[in-house]
Amino acid sequence: PATGKLWPTNYSSGGGMSYTGSMKNVYYALQKSYNTIPALLCKELGRIEIYNFATNNLGLELVQNDQDYAPLSVGALTYGVSITNLVNAYMVYGNGGYYSKAHIISKVESGDGTLVYSGGTDYNQAVDEETSTVMNKLLQNVVKQGTATAAKITASDGTKIPIAGKTGTTSD
């Protein structure tokens, strides 16, 4: 029901909550973890299309109740997602757009070199390579100068290692 309250709000550095609905720059919104832009995008692109993309392309295990705007745009999912499920979804952007379930063991060979086990080789194109490249740049910017700067890593020789990340806020 309509309450007249602006939604969703964003945590602000001053410690309170604020509404930032006029901003339309996705690059900056992701960098600063603004909730309003995903909500606007969800409305614009269509919640069913986003739900289908999340479940079919990224392999997220969502329930029917998650087809609403709050779950899809700000992550207020009915049951949440497991860390493995989330890793699988984000791996798409590090795999050139291909989805594959995370695995630790890719193959096992016997002492004489005979293949005993081979796994984790099913890959599906989830997004095109250009999209995965753009998403990587967006997520790297979150670490470079956004809300995840604490995750920056510098090698012993001073080289800055590119890290992609995403932060979120919750009251739970």
What kind of region is each of these model predictions?
Residues Y28-Q31, P38-C42, F53, L62-Q64, ...:
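Structural recognition of the beta-strand scaffold that forms the well-ordered cores
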Residues P1-I50, G111-N136, Q140:
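Conserved catalytic neighborhood of penicillin-recognizing serine enzymes
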Residues A2-G14, G46-N88:
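Mid-domain, small-residue-enriched loop/turn segments at the edges of structured enzyme/sensor domains
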Residues K24, N35-I37, I48, E61, ...:
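Solvent-exposed loop/turn segments at secondary-structure junctions
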Residues L45, E49, A54-L58, L62, ...:
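A generic secondary-structure signal for well-formed alpha-helical elements
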Residues Y28, Y79-D172:
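A penicillin-recognizing enzyme superfamily signal
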Residues M23, N35-P38, N65-Q67, V74-L77, ...:
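Preference for short coil/turn "hinge" residues that link or interrupt alpha-helices
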